[in-house]
Amino acid sequence: MSPRHAAALGILLFSAASAGAPGGAKPAGDPAKLVVTVNPPAAAPGQEVEVVIRVEPNPGIKVNRYPKMKLQVPAAEGLVGGAEAAVGASEMPPLEHAEQNYYKTVDPVAVKVSVDSRAPRGAHTVPARFTYYYCVAASGYCAPERVSLTIPLQVR
């Protein structure tokens, strides 16, 4: 490779790396709406509830299968036990099948959470973290999205 080609390749790689992803800057606004549901809606102390996160991407946004979407619910003493779930692919598809890395319909992420046997009655909010990766179809910009969210928990 000539020095001129090597310099051009170096500039191209540096530009792509410094932009964070192909296509430049992060678009304004959230890439998707997150819908949180809890089943059953009200639980007794000692019971398990299923927390489900549905990702509804905004127009022009593709949600990646790899890396996996991840939901983390830390333990809250006297309220819930910790839980974690991941949904998606364990590895990236080959480049010739790159479109297979995007969901056509995004799978929900569900996790079973144990309500503490000493949990007080009433309405509570449980903090959680949700991470997913997305790409903007028009620009090729791709990035992780890390969201702190709250899970509504009704203890009866």
Predicted feature descriptions by range:
Residues P22-R156:
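Extracellular/lumen-exposed scaffold segments
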Residues I11-P22:
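Hydrophobic h-region of N-terminal signal peptides that target proteins for export
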Residues L9-I11, I61:
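N-terminal leader/targeting segments
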Residues M1-L9:
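Bacterial N-terminal signal peptides that target proteins for export
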